[in-house]
């Protein structure tokens, strides 16, 4: 919003143009507020684009130099655990030039950045480019989208459809209706973003079925990096996230007063925003007798050694026990029915003890925990199928007491 457009106290700007934010609560949008420093300054800030998890903001800042020339650069900032935005920095020296870079658009894949520039080699005027995030977090050299998308005229404001197939942009090229016109085109395969899948659901109280605003995160199991960290809607408990396809993820959900929820799953086939994968999440209140299956705890086959992929889940258990210091729990180990009962009982006991030992090593008092192996005595699924046996091979923690 710009100064001449919004001059009331609620939307007063710090400079010629500022960024503002409003959040959706239930089916309505809340108050509009200025994003303040360090995002907004006395300069010109505009053209925002959020990452799919809402935690990284890309925008354009224009600063007028001593020669009177206004130069536009693309900046980025991240929101921390304290809900404060970091000091904005240049998105990349490979992207920003001595010319103008603007009209930034980060695709929901969080890996493909489209922008407009007159500082990179092009067809003339403003051209549209793309850059891709590299495994180390840096950006590739920008690639010009080429003719006939770019011409000797100005092209800008590219938006790419969620499935990455269609692009929409503005241009003042010859043959239009005058000034800027809107155009649509099909992106070549080489210029498309990474295939993504949309997932939605609702977080709710397992007893009352009332919606809950809960924090959730999705972790790429291969890299162990958090790819989404957000909160379900305050009014409806609903969430919608976008994730790269062809990967395995751990889902963790937590809210004060409730047991946390965890699950692992794999996304193979891209699903559109209009037909997303649905995962509703019931949260159980903290009380004696309630248990949680630790779905992201992994052991070597037929062994009781914890695999490195288990650390993300175990850190959630540690955080839960640290926050809820009056809770006492039992760590239970369970197996399928393959093998002798004696062998399964022994293996499950050692696996439960391995988790117990890890938690003690992380500073959780041993007096608050116990461990026990149950072998195949408490199946939660039919052992006749591999899928059922996989569900029965599990680690649980159960609340046995809540001290007053």
Regions found by a protein language model. Give the residues of each.
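Short, conserved micro-motifs composed of acidic
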Residues: 1-202, 206-207, 247, 270-276, ...
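Short, ordered, surface-exposed loop/turn motifs in non-cytosolic proteins
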Residues: 71, 207-224
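Short, acidic Ser/Thr/Gly-rich low-complexity loop/linker segments typical of extracellular
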Residues: 222-238
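Structured interaction patches on ligand/partner-binding surfaces of diverse proteins
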Residues: 256-280
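Short, solvent-exposed beta-strand/turn patches at coil↔beta or beta↔helix junctions
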Residues: 286-327, 335-346, 401
């Amino acid at each position: 919003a710009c100064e001449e457009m919004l001059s009331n106290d609620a939307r007063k700007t710090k400079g010629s143009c500022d960024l503002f934010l409003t959040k959706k609560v239930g089916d309505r949008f809340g108050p509009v507020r200025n994003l303040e420093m360090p995002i907004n300054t006395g300069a010109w800030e505009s053209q925002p684009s959020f990452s799919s998890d809402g935690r990284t903001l890309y925008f354009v800042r224009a600063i007028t130099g001593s020669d009177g020339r206004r130069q536009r650069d693309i900046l980025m900032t991240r929101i921390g655990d304290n809900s404060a935005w970091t000091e904005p920095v240049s998105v990349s020296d490979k992207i920003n030039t001595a010319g103008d870079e603007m009209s930034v658009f980060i695709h929901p894949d969080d890996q493909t950045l489209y922008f407009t520039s007159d500082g990179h080699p092009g067809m003339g005027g403003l051209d549209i480019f793309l850059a891709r995030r590299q495994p180390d977090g840096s950006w590739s050299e920008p690639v010009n989208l080429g003719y006939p998308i770019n011409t000797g005229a100005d092209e800008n404001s590219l938006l790419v459809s969620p499935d990455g197939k269609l692009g929409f942009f503005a241009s003042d090229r010859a043959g239009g209706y005058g000034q800027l016109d809107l155009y649509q085109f099909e992106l070549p395969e080489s210029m498309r973003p990474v295939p993504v899948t949309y997932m939605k659901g609702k977080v709710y109280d397992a007893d009352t079925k009332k919606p809950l605003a809960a924090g959730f995160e999705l972790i790429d199991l291969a890299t162990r990096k958090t790819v989404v960290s957000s909160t379900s809607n305050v009014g409806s408990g609903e969430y919608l996230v976008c994730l790269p396809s062809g990967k395995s993820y751990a889902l963790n959900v937590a809210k004060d007063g409730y047991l946390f929820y965890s699950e692992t799953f794999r996304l193979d086939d891209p699903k559109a925003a209009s037909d997303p994968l649905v995962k509703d999440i019931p949260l159980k209140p903290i009380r004696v007798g309630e248990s949680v299956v630790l779905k992201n705890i992994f052991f070597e086959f037929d062994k009781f050694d914890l695999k490195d992929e288990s650390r993300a889940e175990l850190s959630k258990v540690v955080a839960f026990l640290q926050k809820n210091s009056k809770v006492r729990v039992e760590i239970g180990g369970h197996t399928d029915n393959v093998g002798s009962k004696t062998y399964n009982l022994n293996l499950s006991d050692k696996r439960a003890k391995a988790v117990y030992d890890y938690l003690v090593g992380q500073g959780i008092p041993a007096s608050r925990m116990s461990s026990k192996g149950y072998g195949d005595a408490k199946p939660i699924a039919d052992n006749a199928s591999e899928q059922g046996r996989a569900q029965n091979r599990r680690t649980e923690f159960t609340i046995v007491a809540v001290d007053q």
